[in-house]
Protein backbone atom coordinates (compact mmCIF):
# COMPACT_ATOMS: atom_id res chain seq x y z
CA UNK A 1 0.00 0.00 0.00
CA UNK A 2 2.79 2.44 0.81
CA UNK A 3 4.06 2.87 -2.79
CA UNK A 4 0.50 3.63 -3.93
CA UNK A 5 0.04 6.16 -1.12
CA UNK A 6 3.26 7.91 -2.09
CA UNK A 7 1.93 8.46 -5.62
CA UNK A 8 -1.33 9.83 -4.20
CA UNK A 9 0.51 12.17 -1.83
CA UNK A 10 2.88 13.42 -4.54
CA UNK A 11 -0.04 14.24 -6.82
CA UNK A 12 -2.14 15.84 -4.06
CA UNK A 13 0.77 17.96 -2.82
CA UNK A 14 1.69 19.04 -6.33
CA UNK A 15 -1.74 20.39 -7.24
CA UNK A 16 -1.62 23.48 -4.98
CA UNK A 17 2.18 23.86 -5.15
CA UNK A 18 3.08 23.51 -8.82
CA UNK A 19 -0.32 23.26 -10.51
CA UNK A 20 -2.70 20.57 -11.65
CA UNK A 21 -0.86 19.88 -14.89
CA UNK A 22 2.30 18.71 -13.12
CA UNK A 23 0.18 17.02 -10.45
CA UNK A 24 -1.07 14.62 -13.13
CA UNK A 25 2.26 14.37 -14.96
CA UNK A 26 3.54 10.79 -14.59
CA UNK A 27 7.17 11.87 -15.04
CA UNK A 28 6.90 14.40 -12.21
CA UNK A 29 5.26 11.85 -9.91
CA UNK A 30 7.78 9.10 -10.79
CA UNK A 31 10.82 11.22 -9.97
CA UNK A 32 9.42 12.93 -6.85
CA UNK A 33 8.36 9.69 -5.18
CA UNK A 34 11.89 8.30 -5.64
CA UNK A 35 13.74 11.29 -4.19
CA UNK A 36 13.74 10.03 -0.56
CA UNK A 37 15.31 6.69 -1.50
CA UNK A 38 17.72 8.28 -3.96
CA UNK A 39 19.03 10.41 -1.12
CA UNK A 40 18.64 7.96 1.76
CA UNK A 41 20.38 4.92 0.29
CA UNK A 42 23.61 6.73 -0.73
CA UNK A 43 23.67 8.50 2.64
CA UNK A 44 23.51 5.20 4.54
CA UNK A 45 26.15 3.65 2.26
CA UNK A 46 28.49 6.59 2.83
CA UNK A 47 28.01 6.38 6.60
CA UNK A 48 29.25 2.78 6.46
CA UNK A 49 32.15 3.52 4.11
CA UNK A 50 35.67 4.27 5.39
CA UNK A 51 36.36 8.01 5.20
CA UNK A 52 39.26 7.54 2.79
CA UNK A 53 36.93 6.01 0.18
CA UNK A 54 34.00 8.42 0.51
CA UNK A 55 35.37 11.07 -1.82
CA UNK A 56 35.83 8.42 -4.51
CA UNK A 57 32.36 6.86 -4.45
CA UNK A 58 30.25 9.87 -3.41
CA UNK A 59 29.92 11.35 -6.95
CA UNK A 60 28.76 7.99 -8.32
CA UNK A 61 26.23 7.32 -5.57
CA UNK A 62 24.43 10.61 -6.11
CA UNK A 63 24.20 10.41 -9.91
CA UNK A 64 20.58 9.11 -9.80
CA UNK A 65 19.30 11.94 -7.59
CA UNK A 66 21.16 14.53 -9.67
CA UNK A 67 19.43 13.18 -12.76
CA UNK A 68 16.02 13.28 -11.08
CA UNK A 69 16.70 16.84 -9.92
CA UNK A 70 17.61 17.77 -13.50
CA UNK A 71 14.34 16.31 -14.83
CA UNK A 72 12.24 18.00 -12.14
CA UNK A 73 14.00 21.31 -12.75
CA UNK A 74 13.20 21.08 -16.46
CA UNK A 75 9.54 20.41 -15.68
CA UNK A 76 9.07 23.12 -13.07
CA UNK A 77 10.99 25.97 -14.73
CA UNK A 78 8.16 27.03 -17.12
CA UNK A 79 5.73 27.14 -14.17
CA UNK A 80 8.08 29.32 -12.13
CA UNK A 81 8.77 31.65 -15.06
CA UNK A 82 5.03 32.25 -15.41
CA UNK A 83 4.75 32.85 -11.67
CA UNK A 84 7.63 35.35 -11.75
CA UNK A 85 6.03 37.32 -14.58
CA UNK A 86 2.79 37.47 -12.62
CA UNK A 87 4.67 38.63 -9.51
CA UNK A 88 6.53 41.36 -11.40
CA UNK A 89 3.25 42.70 -12.81
CA UNK A 90 1.72 42.98 -9.31
CA UNK A 91 1.68 46.50 -7.92
CA UNK A 92 1.98 45.59 -4.24
CA UNK A 93 4.74 43.01 -3.89
CA UNK A 94 4.19 42.64 -0.13
CA UNK A 95 0.44 42.02 -0.22
CA UNK A 96 -0.55 38.49 0.83
CA UNK A 97 -1.69 36.45 -2.13
CA UNK A 98 -4.39 33.82 -1.85
CA UNK A 99 -4.99 30.74 -3.99
CA UNK A 100 -5.39 31.42 -7.68
CA UNK A 101 -8.52 30.56 -9.60
CA UNK A 102 -6.80 27.46 -11.01
CA UNK A 103 -6.23 26.20 -7.47
CA UNK A 104 -2.50 26.87 -7.20
CA UNK A 105 -1.17 28.60 -4.12
CA UNK A 106 0.81 31.80 -4.66
CA UNK A 107 3.90 30.24 -3.09
CA UNK A 108 6.24 31.76 -5.66
CA UNK A 109 5.03 35.28 -4.86
CA UNK A 110 5.39 34.59 -1.15
CA UNK A 111 8.98 33.40 -1.60
CA UNK A 112 9.98 36.21 -3.97
CA UNK A 113 8.64 38.87 -1.61
CA UNK A 114 10.92 37.53 1.11
CA UNK A 115 14.13 37.04 -0.83
CA UNK A 116 16.78 39.69 -0.10
CA UNK A 117 17.28 42.35 -2.76
CA UNK A 118 20.91 41.25 -3.05
CA UNK A 119 19.90 37.83 -4.39
CA UNK A 120 20.91 37.80 -8.06
CA UNK A 121 19.74 34.41 -9.35
CA UNK A 122 16.21 34.21 -8.01
CA UNK A 123 15.19 31.46 -10.41
CA UNK A 124 17.85 29.07 -9.12
CA UNK A 125 16.83 29.81 -5.55
CA UNK A 126 13.16 29.24 -6.38
CA UNK A 127 13.96 25.87 -7.93
CA UNK A 128 15.99 24.82 -4.88
CA UNK A 129 13.20 25.90 -2.53
CA UNK A 130 10.47 24.15 -4.52
CA UNK A 131 12.43 20.91 -4.76
CA UNK A 132 13.19 21.06 -1.03
CA UNK A 133 9.50 21.60 -0.20
CA UNK A 134 8.49 18.81 -2.56
CA UNK A 135 11.07 16.44 -1.08
CA UNK A 136 10.25 17.21 2.56
CA UNK A 137 6.49 16.93 2.13
CA UNK A 138 6.46 13.49 0.50
CA UNK A 139 7.84 10.74 2.81
CA UNK A 140 6.57 12.19 6.08
CA UNK A 141 3.00 12.72 4.84
CA UNK A 142 2.97 9.31 3.13
CA UNK A 143 4.20 7.56 6.26
CA UNK A 144 1.67 9.26 8.54
CA UNK A 145 -1.15 8.46 6.09
CA UNK A 146 0.01 4.83 5.84
CA UNK A 147 -0.37 4.23 9.57
CA UNK A 148 -3.71 6.07 9.76
CA UNK A 149 -5.15 3.76 7.09
CA UNK A 150 -3.69 0.71 8.83
CA UNK A 151 -5.46 1.72 12.06
CA UNK A 152 -8.74 2.36 10.24
CA UNK A 153 -8.50 -0.95 8.37
CA UNK A 154 -8.06 -2.71 11.72
CA UNK A 155 -11.07 -0.89 13.24
CA UNK A 156 -14.00 -0.77 10.75
CA UNK A 157 -16.30 0.81 13.36
CA UNK A 158 -13.89 3.72 13.71
CA UNK A 159 -13.75 4.17 9.94
CA UNK A 160 -17.55 4.27 9.92
CA UNK A 161 -17.53 6.96 12.63
CA UNK A 162 -15.33 9.11 10.39
CA UNK A 163 -17.70 8.49 7.46
CA UNK A 164 -20.68 9.63 9.56
CA UNK A 165 -18.83 12.83 10.36
CA UNK A 166 -18.04 13.35 6.68
CA UNK A 167 -21.71 12.98 5.80
CA UNK A 168 -22.59 15.62 8.41
CA UNK A 169 -19.86 18.09 7.43
CA UNK A 170 -20.12 17.52 3.66
CA UNK A 171 -23.71 16.32 3.04
CA UNK A 172 -23.51 16.97 -0.70
CA UNK A 173 -20.16 15.29 -1.11
CA UNK A 174 -18.36 18.63 -1.35
CA UNK A 175 -15.68 19.46 1.19
CA UNK A 176 -14.42 23.07 0.94
CA UNK A 177 -11.20 23.89 2.75
CA UNK A 178 -13.14 25.96 5.29
CA UNK A 179 -14.84 22.76 6.51
CA UNK A 180 -11.68 20.76 7.16
CA UNK A 181 -11.38 22.08 10.73
CA UNK A 182 -14.84 20.70 11.48
CA UNK A 183 -13.64 17.11 11.00
CA UNK A 184 -12.93 16.58 14.69
CA UNK A 185 -13.32 12.80 14.71
CA UNK A 186 -10.98 12.45 11.73
CA UNK A 187 -8.51 14.84 13.35
CA UNK A 188 -8.57 12.76 16.54
CA UNK A 189 -7.81 9.58 14.59
CA UNK A 190 -4.94 11.34 12.83
CA UNK A 191 -3.40 12.63 16.05
CA UNK A 192 -3.78 9.30 17.87
CA UNK A 193 -2.18 7.43 14.98
CA UNK A 194 0.70 9.92 15.00
CA UNK A 195 1.09 9.35 18.75
CA UNK A 196 1.13 5.55 18.55
CA UNK A 197 3.03 5.49 15.24
CA UNK A 198 5.31 8.54 15.52
CA UNK A 199 7.25 9.78 12.54
CA UNK A 200 10.41 9.62 14.62
CA UNK A 201 11.39 8.32 18.05
CA UNK A 202 13.81 11.23 18.42
CA UNK A 203 13.09 14.88 17.59
CA UNK A 204 14.53 18.39 17.92
CA UNK A 205 18.08 17.45 17.00
CA UNK A 206 20.55 20.19 17.90
CA UNK A 207 24.32 20.51 17.62
CA UNK A 208 25.91 22.40 20.50
CA UNK A 209 28.01 25.35 19.38
CA UNK A 210 29.40 25.83 22.89
CA UNK A 211 29.57 23.70 26.06
CA UNK A 212 26.26 23.27 27.88
CA UNK A 213 25.57 22.28 31.49
CA UNK A 214 22.16 20.76 32.17
CA UNK A 215 20.81 20.20 35.66
CA UNK A 216 21.79 16.78 36.96
CA UNK A 217 24.03 16.03 33.97
CA UNK A 218 27.73 16.35 33.20
CA UNK A 219 28.76 19.28 31.02
CA UNK A 220 28.18 18.56 27.35
CA UNK A 221 31.04 19.62 25.05
CA UNK A 222 30.71 21.79 21.95
CA UNK A 223 29.99 19.70 18.87
CA UNK A 224 27.81 17.27 20.81
CA UNK A 225 24.39 16.39 19.37
CA UNK A 226 21.34 16.44 21.61
CA UNK A 227 17.69 15.57 20.95
CA UNK A 228 14.34 14.97 22.65
CA UNK A 229 13.08 11.47 23.40
CA UNK A 230 9.68 11.64 21.66
CA UNK A 231 8.93 7.95 22.25
CA UNK A 232 8.60 8.27 26.02
CA UNK A 233 6.44 11.38 25.65
CA UNK A 234 4.06 9.61 23.27
CA UNK A 235 3.81 6.60 25.58
CA UNK A 236 3.93 8.36 28.95
CA UNK A 237 1.34 7.04 31.47
CA UNK A 238 1.47 10.48 33.11
CA UNK A 239 0.12 12.05 29.91
CA UNK A 240 -2.10 9.31 28.48
CA UNK A 241 -4.42 6.71 29.94
CA UNK A 242 -3.46 3.25 28.66
CA UNK A 243 -0.78 4.77 26.41
CA UNK A 244 0.01 1.48 24.65
CA UNK A 245 -3.57 1.23 23.33
CA UNK A 246 -4.67 2.95 20.13
CA UNK A 247 -7.84 4.91 20.93
CA UNK A 248 -8.98 6.82 17.86
CA UNK A 249 -11.46 8.96 19.80
CA UNK A 250 -9.07 9.80 22.66
CA UNK A 251 -8.46 13.38 21.53
CA UNK A 252 -12.03 13.91 20.32
CA UNK A 253 -13.27 13.22 23.85
CA UNK A 254 -10.63 15.51 25.33
CA UNK A 255 -11.77 18.36 23.07
CA UNK A 256 -15.35 18.10 24.34
CA UNK A 257 -14.26 19.99 27.45
CA UNK A 258 -14.70 23.76 26.89
CA UNK A 259 -11.13 24.55 27.94
CA UNK A 260 -9.75 22.09 25.37
CA UNK A 261 -11.59 23.33 22.28
CA UNK A 262 -8.38 24.37 20.54
CA UNK A 263 -6.11 21.73 22.06
CA UNK A 264 -5.33 18.13 21.10
CA UNK A 265 -5.44 18.83 17.37
CA UNK A 266 -3.30 16.90 14.89
CA UNK A 267 -1.23 19.95 13.86
CA UNK A 268 -0.93 21.53 17.32
CA UNK A 269 2.42 22.21 18.93
CA UNK A 270 3.05 21.42 22.57
CA UNK A 271 5.04 19.44 25.09
CA UNK A 272 2.67 16.49 24.59
CA UNK A 273 3.06 16.53 20.79
CA UNK A 274 6.81 16.58 20.08
CA UNK A 275 6.65 15.34 16.50
CA UNK A 276 6.28 18.79 14.92
CA UNK A 277 9.16 20.36 16.82
CA UNK A 278 8.61 23.60 18.69
CA UNK A 279 9.14 27.34 18.62
CA UNK A 280 10.50 29.07 15.51
CA UNK A 281 11.96 25.76 14.30
CA UNK A 282 8.58 23.95 14.32
CA UNK A 283 7.52 22.32 11.06
CA UNK A 284 6.23 25.17 8.84
CA UNK A 285 4.26 22.78 6.63
CA UNK A 286 2.20 21.08 9.33
CA UNK A 287 -1.08 22.81 8.37
CA UNK A 288 -0.48 21.93 4.72
CA UNK A 289 0.12 18.30 5.71
CA UNK A 290 -3.00 18.38 7.90
CA UNK A 291 -5.16 19.51 4.97
CA UNK A 292 -3.55 17.09 2.51
CA UNK A 293 -4.14 14.08 4.75
CA UNK A 294 -7.75 15.06 5.47
CA UNK A 295 -8.53 15.52 1.77
CA UNK A 296 -7.06 12.12 0.89
CA UNK A 297 -8.78 10.37 3.81
CA UNK A 298 -12.12 11.96 2.91
CA UNK A 299 -11.87 10.63 -0.63
CA UNK A 300 -10.72 7.14 0.35
CA UNK A 301 -13.27 6.63 3.13
CA UNK A 302 -16.12 8.00 1.02
CA UNK A 303 -15.38 5.76 -1.95
CA UNK A 304 -13.89 2.62 -0.36
CA UNK A 305 -14.28 0.13 2.47
CA UNK A 306 -10.93 -1.11 3.73
CA UNK A 307 -9.75 -4.00 5.86
CA UNK A 308 -6.63 -5.98 6.60
CA UNK A 309 -6.18 -9.24 4.66
CA UNK A 310 -7.68 -12.30 6.44
CA UNK A 311 -5.40 -13.61 9.15
CA UNK A 312 -3.07 -10.61 8.93
CA UNK A 313 -2.57 -8.18 11.78
CA UNK A 314 -1.09 -4.72 11.69
CA UNK A 315 2.33 -4.70 10.01
CA UNK A 316 5.36 -4.45 12.25
CA UNK A 317 6.79 -1.00 12.75
CA UNK A 318 10.27 -0.35 11.44
CA UNK A 319 12.68 2.52 11.92
CA UNK A 320 15.64 4.00 10.11
CA UNK A 321 19.08 4.30 11.77
CA UNK A 322 18.25 7.91 12.75
CA UNK A 323 15.02 6.88 14.50
CA UNK A 324 12.64 7.90 11.71
CA UNK A 325 9.73 5.61 10.84
CA UNK A 326 10.18 3.01 8.14
CA UNK A 327 6.76 1.75 6.97
CA UNK A 328 6.43 -1.81 5.73
CA UNK A 329 6.49 -1.20 1.98
CA UNK A 330 5.12 -4.71 1.33
CA UNK A 331 2.10 -4.38 3.63
CA UNK A 332 -1.29 -4.78 1.96
CA UNK A 333 -4.75 -3.45 2.75
CA UNK A 334 -7.89 -4.63 0.95
CA UNK A 335 -10.01 -1.91 -0.69
CA UNK A 336 -13.57 -2.41 -1.93
CA UNK A 337 -15.59 0.23 -3.80
CA UNK A 338 -18.58 1.59 -1.90
CA UNK A 339 -21.95 2.31 -3.46
CA UNK A 340 -22.49 6.07 -3.29
Curated annotation (Swiss-Prot):
<keyword id="KW-0408">Iron</keyword>
<dbReference type="GO" id="GO:0005506">
    <property type="term" value="F:iron ion binding"/>
</dbReference>
<dbReference type="GO" id="GO:0016705">
    <property type="term" value="F:oxidoreductase activity, acting on paired donors, with incorporation or reduction of molecular oxygen"/>
</dbReference>
<feature type="glycosylation site" description="N-linked (GlcNAc...) asparagine">
    <location>
        <position position="322"/>
    </location>
</feature>
<comment type="function">
    <text>Cytochrome P450 monooxygenase; part of the gene cluster that mediates the biosynthesis of chaetoglobosin A which has a unique inhibitory activity against actin polymerization in mammalian cells. Chaetoglobosin A and its intermediates are involved in the morphological differentiation of C.globosum. The first step of the pathway is the synthesis of prochaetoglobosin I via condensation of one acetyl-CoA, 8 malonyl-CoA, and a L-tryptophan molecule by the PKS-NRPS hybrid synthetase cheA, followed by reduction of backbone double bond to install desired geometry by the enoyl reductase cheB.</text>
</comment>
<keyword id="KW-0479">Metal-binding</keyword>
<protein>
    <recommendedName>
        <fullName>Cytochrome P450 monooxygenase cheG</fullName>
        <ecNumber>1.-.-.-</ecNumber>
    </recommendedName>
</protein>
<comment type="similarity">
    <text>Belongs to the cytochrome P450 family.</text>
</comment>
<feature type="region of interest" description="Disordered">
    <location>
        <begin position="308"/>
        <end position="340"/>
    </location>
</feature>
<keyword id="KW-0325">Glycoprotein</keyword>
<comment type="pathway">
    <text>Secondary metabolite biosynthesis.</text>
</comment>
<keyword id="KW-1133">Transmembrane helix</keyword>
<dbReference type="InterPro" id="IPR036396">
    <property type="entry name" value="Cyt_P450_sf"/>
</dbReference>
<keyword id="KW-0812">Transmembrane</keyword>
<feature type="transmembrane region" description="Helical">
    <location>
        <begin position="37"/>
        <end position="57"/>
    </location>
</feature>
<dbReference type="GO" id="GO:0016020">
    <property type="term" value="C:membrane"/>
</dbReference>
<keyword id="KW-0560">Oxidoreductase</keyword>
<dbReference type="GO" id="GO:0019748">
    <property type="term" value="P:secondary metabolic process"/>
</dbReference>
<keyword id="KW-0472">Membrane</keyword>
<feature type="glycosylation site" description="N-linked (GlcNAc...) asparagine">
    <location>
        <position position="25"/>
    </location>
</feature>
<dbReference type="Pfam" id="PF00067">
    <property type="entry name" value="p450"/>
</dbReference>
<dbReference type="GO" id="GO:0020037">
    <property type="term" value="F:heme binding"/>
</dbReference>
<dbReference type="GO" id="GO:0004497">
    <property type="term" value="F:monooxygenase activity"/>
</dbReference>
<dbReference type="InterPro" id="IPR001128">
    <property type="entry name" value="Cyt_P450"/>
</dbReference>
<dbReference type="InterPro" id="IPR002403">
    <property type="entry name" value="Cyt_P450_E_grp-IV"/>
</dbReference>
<keyword id="KW-0349">Heme</keyword>
<feature type="binding site" description="axial binding residue">
    <location>
        <position position="283"/>
    </location>
    <ligand>
        <name>heme</name>
    </ligand>
</feature>
<keyword id="KW-0503">Monooxygenase</keyword>
